[in-house]
C-alpha cells in the first residue's frame, strides 16, 4: 500500500515538473489595440466588437452586407470610452477570394495600424438529415465556416509574427465538439477549426501569438432564428436540453479568454464538461487547467454516456412517431 502511495506521489511530482514550464501568457491590453472582427455586422460578432470597444479598442468590422455594417457601426460606437476610438467598416466575402481578403486587411492596417487581435466569427449554419441536404451545401459549409477563417488568419499572421505578438480567435460551436443529429454538414466545418487552431498554435507560440477556439452553445442571434426554420425535430429536441444563451454573455466570456490567451473558451457547465472531455492533445496555459482535465475526465465521460443515451432515445422516439403517422395515413 505504501509503495502505491509513494508511486502516486512521485508520478504527481513528475507531472508537475513536466508541466511547470507552462507559463500563462501576458494578457493583451485592449485599450488602443486594433481588433478585426469578421461576421461583425450581427450576432456574436457584433457583440464581441462592442465588448472590445468598451475596453478602448479600435475596431474593424468585416461582413458582406454594407447596410448591416453601417447599422452595426452605429451600435458599437455607443460604447466608446474615449473620443479617439474608431470603427472601420469593410464589406467583403471572407470565404470567396483570398486576394480580396488580403487587400482589405491591408487597408485596415494602413488606417488603424497592425492587427492585434483577429476574431474569426463569420459563419453560417444549416441543419437537415444527411440524405436530404443538397451536396453543394456541404461544400458551402466548409467554404464559409473553415476557409472563411483561414483567409483572414493568413492575411494577418505575417505581421503578427514580425511584431511577435497577437491573438487569433476562432468562433466554433458546441457542435464542433460533438456531432449531433442534423449537423452532418455543419459539424465537420466547425470541427475543422479545432485542427487548424491546434496546428497554428504550435507554430505561433514561439512568436508570442496565442490562439483561442470558442465553443458557444445555441445563441439568440439572427442566424440561429433562421436555422430553426428548417431544423429537424430531433435536432430541436436535443438542442433544447442545453437552452439558449444571449450573445452579449457569450461575447464577454470569449473576449476575456482571448485576452488571457486561453486556447479553449467554453460556456456553462455543459461547455466546461465538453471541453474537458474533448481536450485531447490541445495546449493548456496553466498547470491548474491541465490537472482539472486529468482529474475530471472519468467523471465527465460517465455523465456524457447518459447524455448520449438520452439523445439516442430522442432519435428513436421521433422515428417511431413518424412511422406510426405514416401507418395511420395509409389506413385512411
From Swiss-Prot:
Binding of NADPH, residues: 39, 41-43, 64-65, 68, 93
GO biological process entries: 3-keto-sphinganine metabolic process; intracellular sphingolipid homeostasis; platelet formation; sphingolipid biosynthetic process; sphingolipid mediated signaling pathway; sphingomyelin biosynthetic process
Protein name: 3-dehydrosphinganine reductase
Subcellular location: Endoplasmic reticulum
Binding site for NADP(+): 186, 190
Chief place where the protein resides: endoplasmic reticulum
Keyword check for Signal: yes
The enzyme's E.C. designation: 1.1.1.102
Signal peptide annotation: 1-25
Motif GXSXG positions after renumbering to this chain: 39-43
Catalytic residues of the enzyme: 172, 186, 190
Role played: Catalyzes the reduction of 3'-oxosphinganine (3-ketodihydrosphingosine/KDS) to sphinganine (dihydrosphingosine/DHS), the second step of de novo sphingolipid biosynthesis.
Annotated catalysed reactions: sphinganine + NADP(+) = 3-oxosphinganine + NADPH + H(+)
Summary of the knockout phenotype: Morpholino-mediated knockdown leads to increased 3-oxosphinganine levels, reduced thrombocyte levels and results in curved tails. Morpholino-mediated knockdown does not alter the level of dihydroceramides, ceramides, sphingomyelins and glycosphingolipids that are downstream of the enzyme.
Species in which this protein is naturally found: Danio rerio
PANTHER family: 3-KETODIHYDROSPHINGOSINE REDUCTASE
Family per similarity comment: Belongs to the short-chain dehydrogenases/reductases (SDR) family.
SUPFAM superfamilies (UniProt xref): NAD(P)-binding Rossmann-fold domains
Gene: kdsr
